[in-house]
Design a protein with these regions (language model features):
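Pyridoxal 5′-phosphate
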Residues: 1-401
Length: 401
């Protein structure tokens, strides 16, 4: 299946699911790696590089490649290259941001929201066990944080505010710049989990007064197993992983050079292609949401519509069916989608995000999430709209709904 934009004409095989898939709409769980990224990574995987900490020529070349990737990622978020710390994932970056900062902070109070990624929420819960207090700010019916509610939650003992840039489960873009303006100048650090948003919506660490920002490589169509935390100069952190002095002492262990180089290329492509690709994906998103609401009785969009939503994200709740049954039926017909966050799905628990926006248990059971990406076509959207209504009708009939 050919992609519609850019210079890479061939869709990666990983998006095909063994040749069956007619529509791959689970990019938030795994984004196929861009072939342009793979091409740059290949020499590093085939033995053409050294250790970036070594002093010989291959090591110096490896360090130059590492620093080049750092610069590309910094350009994507408008930050300084020296602030980029490479990690193995955005989850690790979130853990380092919260627990690493808390270990050096004088204050013992944190502010976050009830809809954060589980890596942020579970880090906060772990800090609570260590004697910190945490304020969990509620959201409105579309999952949006009120900056004034964040301001009201701040105390004289607040050390850190952590608010995601956007929800990976319902697509809500948060008012990060407004929160940053409230935090700026109060001696409080501001952390943003930017997974899902960076490369799709404009985000600048300086304009939004961000001190710590977490990124995922795969979310940018880079290789999995790589992430980064951007840290503003003079922001103090304690490492979670100790050993050597790699990554300025913040993250020990030899860097995964092929993955890091790939992440740098992915970041550069995302920066250059963001405006055009986001507009294309927003059109597909609206086509899908409008079509589902029009053809599936009682289907309701979760999260906002329009500019307040991530351009690649469409999520709905469908009463009278269970998401697992719908997804299995869709999969048998060549459509890959999800019920929300892949990380949360592993627990088998009801979505904390859906609970936060007022979806009760029965409604949450019918939560479906479709996320698009660089190779998504209008034909794939139409395949979902052709198949989903009949799937829901059949399952409702079987359930007696």
């Amino acid at each position: 299946m050919a992609r519609s934009t850019g210079s890479s004409s061939e869709r990666p095989d990983s998006a095909r699911a063994g040749g069956l898939t007619r529509a791959y709409l689970d990019y938030a769980s795994f984004a196929p790696v861009d072939p342009r990224v793979v091409a740059v990574m290949r020499p590093f995987l085939e033995g053409g590089a050294g250790n970036p900490s070594a002093s010989h020529s291959l090591g110096l070349e490896a360090k130059a490649s590492l620093d080049g990737a750092r610069a590309k990622i910094a350009r994507l978020v408008g930050g300084t290259p020296a602030g980029v710390i490479f990690t193995a994932s955005a989850t690790e970056a979130n853990n380092l941001a919260l627990k690493g900062f808390a270990a050096r902070a004088s204050g013992r109070h944190l502010v976050t929201s009830v809809v954060e990624h589980v890596s942020v929420l579970n880090s906060c819960r772990e800090l609570e066990k260590r004697g910190f207090t945490v304020a969990y700010v509620p959201v409105d019916g579309e999952g949006r944080v009120d900056p004034d509610a964040v301001a009201r939650a701040i105390t004289d003992d607040t050390a850190l505010v952590s608010i995601q840039a956007a929800s990976g489960e319902i697509g809500t873009v948060q008012p990060i710049a407004a929160v940053g303006r409230l935090v700026r100048g109060r001696g409080i650090a501001f952390h943003v989990d930017a997974v899902g948003a960076v490369g799709r919506v404009g985000l600048s660490v300086d304009e939004c007064a961000i001190d710590l920002l977490s990124l995922s490589s795969n979310d940018l169509h880079g290789p999995p197993g790589a992430g980064a935390l951007w840290v503003r100069p003079q922001t103090k952190l304690s490492p979670l992983i100790v050993g050597g002095a790699q990554e300025q002492g913040f993250r020990a262990g030899t860097e995964n050079l092929p993955a890091v180089v790939g992440m740098g290329v992915a970041a550069e492509l995302a920066r250059v292609e963001r405006a055009t690709e986001s507009a294309r994906l927003a059109t597909l998103r609206d086509r899908l949401l409008d079509g589902i609401v029009a053809t599936v009785a009682d289907a309701r969009v979760t999260g906002p519509r329009g500019a307040g939503r991530l351009p690649h994200h469409a999520s709905v709740v469908v009463p009278g069916v269970k998401a697992d049954a719908v997804l299995m039926d869709l999969d048998l017909r060549g459509i890959a989608a999800s019920s929300g966050s892949a990380c949360s799905a592993l627990t088998g628990e009801a979505s904390h995000v859906l609970r936060a926006i007022g979806c009760d248990g029965s409604a949450a059971e019918g939560s479906l999430c479709f996320t698009t990406g660089r190779w998504t076509t209008a034909a794939e959207i139409d395949a979902v709209l052709d198949i989903l209504p009949a799937v829901v009708t059949r399952l409702r009939r079987l359930a007696g709904a």
